[in-house]
A protein has these predicted regions:
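Bacterial N-terminal signal peptides
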Residues: 5-15
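Short amphipathic, basic-aromatic surface patches that mediate peripheral association
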Residues: 32-41, 54-60
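A short tyrosine-centered beta-strand micro-motif
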Residues: 105-119
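A beta-strand/beta-hairpin structural motif
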Residues: 79-101
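Short beta-strand elements
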Residues: 124-158
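Contiguous segments within soluble domain cores/interaction surfaces
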Residues: 48-85
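Boundary at the C-terminal end of the N-terminal hydrophobic targeting segment
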Residues: 15-23
Length: 158
């Protein structure tokens, strides 16, 4: 009986340790820190997207929704209400399309852009009232440790 309990305890401890290690890995790999510009008013909860367009695509947000071989890598999380200067992080725990994990992203040069989808009536990244960042050209690698920082500075007019 004692051996059975000891075996169960060790197995449980190993599982907890493995999960903690995996959680730590998600914080160490490629991640995006998106903040709300201090000049903007507080925002309600919404869907936060980061679009990564390879090559010379200057406005990645306009590529959201493409599928198949032309699909643009996009990360998404449900964002809490944001105060000016506050933000959210998108990392390996975020939903990603068209890949299964962010680790599958091919290293290279990308234009990246953040979009905060707030319009509940029109579910489109280009909907009036949504916020977005300026595009940023950056070298991305799934193994990089330094975060990519983006600031939501613009609003799509109503």
């Amino acid at each position: 009986m004692f051996r059975t309990l000891l075996t169960l305890f060790v197995a449980t401890l190993g599982a907890v340790d493995l999960q903690a290690g995996q959680a730590g890995q998600s914080r160490q790999g490629l991640r995006f820190e998106v903040t709300l510009d201090p000049s903007l008013s507080p925002q309600p909860p919404g869907r936060l997207l980061v679009v990564m367009a390879p090559g010379d695509r200057v406005e990645p947000r306009r590529l959201i929704g493409r599928t198949g071989r032309n699909a643009t890598p996009t990360l998404a999380v449900d964002a809490p209400a944001l105060a000016p200067g506050a933000g959210a992080t998108l990392d390996a725990t975020a939903a990603v399309f068209p890949m299964e994990t962010l680790a599958e992203l091919e290293a290279g040069e990308y234009h990246v852009q953040a979009v905060l989808s707030l319009n509940r009536d029109l579910r489109s990244p280009g909907a009036p009232g949504n916020l977005y960042s300026e595009p940023l050209r950056v070298a991305l690698d799934p193994s990089q440790t330094e975060p990519v920082r983006l600031a939501l500075t613009r609003r799509i007019p109503d």
